[in-house]
Amino acid sequence: MRCLTTPVLLRALAQAARAGPPGGRSLHSSAVAATYKYVNMQDPEMDMKSVTDRAARTLLWTELFRGLGMTLSYLFREPATINYPFEKGPLSPRFRGEHALRRYPSGEERCIACKLCEAICPAQAITIEAEPRADGSRRTTRYDIDMTKCIYCGFCQEACPVDAIVEGPNFEFSTETHEELLYNKEKLLNNGDKWEAEITANIQADYLYR
């Protein structure tokens, strides 16, 4: 059996391509190809008006100037964006931001160490330790939130029976180290003291739906 060299093989393939498919019938001339419809193919209109319009668009760059005119029109409109961080948009009363522990007007901590927030947290970001006081009430000795685990679902705020743990209006609390996002009780109480007015207003605005 003779082995075909590369030049011979290439010549054979070229002759087969010129001869067409077996049977001598091309796909483009078959009955199936005759039924094809070119949906997006449009023949250009050749009447005088259409030819003149196409020539004007090509020679005078009408579409280019139309686009430039639209761009210039937006320069004199009211901007749709704000200059953050110097300007800030409104926040919903239901906005879930940085966590905080609240106090009563007397200064007493609201948290009763029921641990419902710790139990309901799907990310297991909350750690609570508590002990009874001399008057028989329970108060937390440790209240930690790992903000790197928190998913800001708001379940802790919804589960709290005394509105102690809340998610405040602050969303600007980026840090440079991981340790700064490990909140302890003191940090959470300071947040509550700082944002108490806004938190109270948000709770009152949303009381019908709580």
From Swiss-Prot:
Single biological process term from Gene Ontology? mitochondrial respiratory chain complex I assembly
Topology versus the membrane: Peripheral membrane protein
Q: What is its EC number?
A: 7.1.1.2
Identify the domain of life. Answer: Eukaryota
Give a GO molecular function annotation for the protein.
Answer: metal ion binding
- InterPro entries, A to Z: 4Fe4S_Fe-S-bd, 4Fe4S_Fe_S_CS, NADH_quinone_OxRdtase_chainI
Keywords of the record = 4Fe-4S, Electron transport, Iron, Iron-sulfur, Membrane, Metal-binding, Mitochondrion, Mitochondrion inner membrane, NAD, Oxidoreductase, Repeat, Respiratory chain, Transit peptide, Translocase, Transport, Ubiquinone
Q: Which reaction does it catalyse?
A: a ubiquinone + NADH + 5 H(+)(in) = a ubiquinol + NAD(+) + 4 H(+)(out)
Enumerate the residues binding [4Fe-4S] cluster 2. Answer: 121, 150, 153, 156
Q: Can you cite an annotated GO cellular component?
A: mitochondrion
Q: How is the cofactor bound?
A: Binds 2 [4Fe-4S] cluster.
Query: What's this protein's function?
Result: Core subunit of the mitochondrial membrane respiratory chain NADH dehydrogenase (Complex I) which catalyzes electron transfer from NADH through the respiratory chain, using ubiquinone as an electron acceptor. Essential for the catalytic activity and assembly of complex I.
Task: Name the family.
Answer: Belongs to the complex I 23 kDa subunit family.
Q: How does it assemble?
A: Core subunit of respiratory chain NADH dehydrogenase (Complex I) which is composed of 45 different subunits. This is a component of the iron-sulfur (IP) fragment of the enzyme. Interacts with RAB5IF.
Q: Which NCBIfam families match?
A: NuoI (TIGR01971), PRK05888.1-4 (NF004538), PRK05888.1-5 (NF004539)
Q: Which HAMAP family match?
A: NDH1_NuoI (MF_01351)
Q: Which protein is depicted? A: NADH dehydrogenase [ubiquinone] iron-sulfur protein 8, mitochondrial
Species per Swiss-Prot/TrEMBL record: Gorilla gorilla gorilla (Western lowland gorilla)
Q: What is the lineage of its organism?
A: Eukaryota, Metazoa, Chordata, Craniata, Vertebrata
